[in-house]
Amino acid sequence: MSDSPIELMRSTLAGFQIAPDVKTISNIQDIRAQIQSFREKELEGSQTKFKVLSRKLEISTQAMESLKQTAESSQHAEEILSREKEKFRIAKLLNITENEIMSLESQLQKMKEQLLQLEERENTSEDICQSEENANMLKLNFYHSLGFDLETAENTGNKRVIIHTENDLQTVQISNKYSPYFYSNYFWDLLDDSKDKK
């Protein structure tokens, strides 16, 4: 056996088995890393929850403050709402009234136009009646000059024609059985006969 220190150290080191220890140390380091990661995640989760709870607390505080203000001004808000409803109702009534006024104005304008048309027709009818009366007067004067006189019975309304000739006087009753054309020819024939007798 050599007494050299170097050889002694080598033989001593050769007797140690460090591979299992190295593996154990590596496993310990992995576990520590996992624990550290888990703690960091837990911390992040706790911080997130804390932020969420803080935000909820802030919102709840604001809501409570808003509720207090609303409770204090609820009566005023109801009055404003009631006034707004009344304004809306009045505006609606005004709109309906304006539409009715426009409709009535349109109807009035149409009635004025119809009245004007009726007046024009009445004036035209009066002119026509006047013209017819004038024409009838001319016809009666003409027939009278020929010896024809038209008479109407007051009690019955029947009409008759009295024909005056130099030698005779004839009366012809006018009936609806015969046409005006028939009577016209008949009267002219009488005139011709009276002329022939002359």
Curated annotation (Swiss-Prot):
Coiled-coil residues are 51-130
Q: Which InterPro entries match?
A: Ndc80_Spc24, Spc24_Fungi_globular_sf
Localization (cell): Nucleus; Chromosome, Centromere, Kinetochore; Cytoplasm, Cytoskeleton, Microtubule organizing center, Spindle pole body
Q: What is this protein called?
A: Kinetochore protein spc24
Instruction: Give the GO cellular component terms, alphabetically.
Output: chromosome, centromeric region; condensed chromosome, centromeric region; cytosol; kinetochore; Ndc80 complex; nucleus; spindle pole body
* Signal peptide limits: none
Q: What does this protein do?
A: Acts as a component of the NMS (Ndc80-MIND-Spc7) super complex which has a role in kinetochore function during late meiotic prophase and throughout the mitotic cell cycle. Acts as a component of the essential kinetochore-associated NDC80 complex, which is required for chromosome segregation and spindle checkpoint activity.
GO BP term, example: cell division
